[in-house]
Amino acid sequence: MGKIIGIDLGTTNSCVAVMEGGKPKVIENSEGARTTPSVVAYAEDGEILTGAPAKRQAVTNAKNTLFAVKRLIGRRFEEKEVQKDIDLMPYTICKADNSDAWVEVRGKKIAPPQVSAEVLRKMKKTAEDYLGEEVTEAVITVPAYFNDSQRQATKDAGRIAGLEVKRIINEPTAAALAFGMDKKPGDSKIAVYDLGGGTFDISIIEIADIDGEHQFEVLATNGDTFLGGEDFDQRLIDYIVTEFKKEQGVDLKKDVLALQRLKEAAEKAKIELSSGQQTEVNLPYITADASGPKHLAVKITRAKFESLVEDLVQRTIEPCRVALKDAGLKINDIDDVILVGGQSRMPKVQEKVKEFFGKEARRDVNPDEAVAVGAAIQGGVLQGEVKDVLLLDVTPLSLGIETLGGVMTKLIQKNTTVPTKASQVFSTADDNQSAVTIHVLQGEREMASGNKSLGQFNLSDIPPAPRGMPQIEVTFDIDANGILHVSAKDKATGKENKIKIQANSGLSEDEIQRMVQDAAAHAEEDKKAHELVDIRNQCDALVHSVKKSLTEYGDKISADEKEKIEQAMKDAEEALKGNDKDTIEARMQALATASQKLGEQMYAQSQGAEGGATDEAAGGGSTGGSKAADADVVDAEFTEVKDKK
């Protein structure tokens, strides 16, 4: 049985970890970094770049470089958050046939789970390279406040990447696992404040020691799935653009290339301001107009940056207040505060958290890696490698159905521990009604229209009866991944209809299968490209080596042999100009065969040289025949030196 890896699929960066010898280990990627940018680029030649290579070429390929796609996953095109992103992103966000928000790259529409799958494939490959075996199973984390569609879409992304998602767990819960695993026994209540690249979560978690077993129980969770580091970057970009327009009279918002350079610079400046009091954004030749090139140089102080994002930091406090209230706790009941997510490194954020909770946040948790570590621990629990750990997570939002008058009737309240099941009996609204439509909703608003629609299905063939008479039992069943299954049953006839909630948007099974096949085909292309590079390198090295040897030892072989080698070398060099792996391999073999005689001469020469050295060391105690051979060797060396002159 292979390892179950833990993946933190982040908005800005992703991370992968695995249990090894009972301890979680964060795995470095092929570039040697412990986190990988969640960036995917589609090159002109059809190649797909992921991670740091994709991020590096973003400036020159802005329209086809996708980042922060997690903010679109499982969302409808009409949602106001998506509409807000359309104006900010250099790439195109379009409406899919099912009304979901998709992206368009090089004239092709792509679903966000497909883009996330590329990042997951990179994480999978990172783990496989480290473990030396195939990986097919994973625990993937999502923001605690992700709704059902977003969780389902994340699971789909895993499938497209060739991973069986054994469990979807909430990011703050994963961070709590990472924090609480090696803590001394005893009960404690912790607040996990998770401010990442695109989402914010707060979870109140109780870690209890029950008969030697670590129990992690989520008491309440809250958050905002459209608030994170990307928004902080955007405030900085807007400020710089405004300043530049004041000075130079040029609006950089209309220049995609300039904006991409500015985005990188803003991110860097934001990070620098976490340790320094001032930084300068310096971008020469940012743009040009009739008067010539323009250079951008803007000084930003930490105080200025803090004033730009003050309301964003403040927005994280209300969910903290609500989560505490839902958990039935006071601020004094919290023993530890843990900060997770890169944006939580900002001093102003830490100051606000300290101000609200009345205590310093813990510094012994790595904000970038804790979530992946927790996911790996959960993988270990599922595999039986980690014992004595029980994780009790919750559903972040209430679930219910639409009833008469457009009201949402809740069957499962928010912060209910999952897995869970709830049933309620409903009836018909009209006389002789033969079918009912079950409209499934998620959210906290009283009216159905204010909540997220997860999907709907019909229960038909209800026997004619006066309104209010038929007994229709609706059952909601949430699995451990927080994904909902709904059934409706007519108690009189026993007729039942069930669905696993597939958002009335979402990807259909056929689409997922097609994307899985696309990804597999792409993996095969990658493998072939890799093999071509390997054989090309081998052939190149052989040509170089034979060329060098021919220069040194060419006079030791016949002119005929030399000509054969030179021809084989020319053929190999010609093959290297093309992309046919088999041709390169065949020409390389031909060159290896042709240069065999040359190799023999080199070997004989080196053996002879060694023999001479041995005789000399023996002080002349060798036979005359040996001496004759030695003389030959010295002669040959002498001739070679003379030739070079």
Swiss-Prot record:
Family (UniProt): Belongs to the heat shock protein 70 family.
CDD domains: ASKHA_NBD_HSP70_DnaK-like (cd10234)
Induction per the UniProt record: By stress conditions e.g. heat shock.
Lineage: Bacteria, Pseudomonadati, Pseudomonadota, Betaproteobacteria, Rhodocyclales
Region annotation Disordered: where it falls in the sequence: 601-645
Keyword annotations from UniProtKB, A to Z: ATP-binding, Chaperone, Nucleotide-binding, Phosphoprotein, Stress response
Organism annotation: Aromatoleum aromaticum (strain DSM 19018 / LMG 30748 / EbN1) (Azoarcus sp. (strain EbN1))
Matches recorded under NCBIfam families: PRK00290.1, PRK05183.1, prok_dnaK
PANTHER family for the chain: HEAT SHOCK PROTEIN 70KDA
Domain of life: Bacteria
A Pfam family reported for this protein in Swiss-Prot or TrEMBL: HSP70
HAMAP family: DnaK (MF_00332)
Any one Gene Ontology molecular-function term assigned to this protein's record: ATP-dependent protein folding chaperone
Protein name as catalogued: Chaperone protein DnaK
Positions bearing Phosphothreonine: T199
Biological role: Acts as a chaperone.
Keyword Nucleotide-binding tagged: yes
